[in-house]
Every structure is written in C-alpha cells, then in structure tokens.
C-alpha cells in the first residue's frame, strides 16, 4: 500500500524533536552527518524566538507522524530591488516520496514567497541528486550551472573579519 499524502503546516514550538530527526535523516542522505551540530534549542531560537531568522514547515500524516519538512529564510536581490526567499532544506522521507508531499512543501514555500512580494525563490541541489534536479526542472526551477556556491564557515568568518 502506498503512503497517503501528508498535510503541510507551519512548524510550531514543540516540533523541534521531529524537525531535528528529519534534519538528521537529510544529513545522512546527503552524506553530511559529520557536519550536523544543530540541537533542539538551536531550532527553537531559529524558528520560534522573537525575530527568528528562519521559518519551517512540517509535512505530517493523519496520525501526526512528521514525514517531511522545509526550512526557508528571507534574502534580497539588489538587481530586482525586491525581497526573495531562500529554501535552505526540503526533505521527504523515502516512504512518502512520490505522494506529492515534496511538491506541496515547495508550493507552501512559494506561497510564503508571494506573501513577501518575493521576486525569486532560490535553493541549491547537490549535483549527484539527479532525481531532485529533474523534479526541480519539472516545476519550473532553473539550474544555474554558471554559478558556484561560496561558503565561509564560522572560523573563516572570524579570521577574515579580524583582518
């Protein structure tokens, strides 16, 4: 029997355990569990504190099991002179892939982008994740091969800022 589609809702305080479990699953899937240091307290601050910098959505079954999530935050395009939305994570458990849950998570983030008058929604995808790349293209996403992600970790930020 195939899994039923999940309901999408904003994450609320008390969802930290479920969110962290799903984040851990994504880290394992992406072979990045060695860099995962987030805690439930970190998620509380990130999503639910006053002035929280990010938002989260949960996909739940009728029984309340969390089977997917999306994390987003606002950014800005100087070229458009408009806000944007950056999708940090989108993940659906393998048992619920193919049910439309991932698409509905992305649609929910797209609605948030519209509410914020965003000129664009952006995210990255690992180059080996061909299934995700094909899916993103099928929903209108454009893979920008000419751009490369640049990352500066906390230690590098401190060193660079110090001069």
Model-derived regions: residue spans:
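A conserved beta-strand-loop-helix scaffold within acyl/acetyltransferase catalytic domains
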Residues: 72-79
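Conserved beta-strand-loop-alpha-helix junction that forms the acyl-donor binding cleft
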Residues: 123-132, 151-154
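Conserved beta-hairpin
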Residues: 54-68
